[in-house]
């Protein structure tokens, strides 16, 4: 009975968790439970997620992948997510990730973000991290701006641009943005820009500190970063 109640509590607070993530969360809380039992209880309670998976194009499936990151601060990835306040005013959020540790290094929301602001956000991150070798970006105007080009030159960073019209070239950050939208942006009303910033930052901290990632051996990004010799930033 207690296991069933805890499963309900986790599912209610983390609406995009399937039974596998709930099983990991239970284990992290010290509960000894079989994953098959978690799956059975999850289904009995009608908590099944219904996810429509996108159809993968053959050309994308056969694309030669970029070399994977093998160390922290080797490859970062950057992109934008758009959303709105409760009154319809638009906002944009810059997402910045370490591809190896899966850490969300920054999620900065504003009404609009220029190339100069992108450079300033990167400078702020460099107060706690070393500069990466490469940053993967798309061909958006903020990323092809003179301000970011100059920043990259001054810090010895290569800007690795995606091919136009090929979001799969930066698939990791696209996947992260999907989680951000499902677990945060779609779960809240933002009453103001400050309210949006506070809720997005709270989710970023949860993602880094408390959300286990299957690709990291069910560790959180901060736990994995610590094992890799990085002192996780704020």
Language-model features and meaning:
Residues 1-234:
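Charged DNA-binding/catalytic regions of mobile-element recombinases
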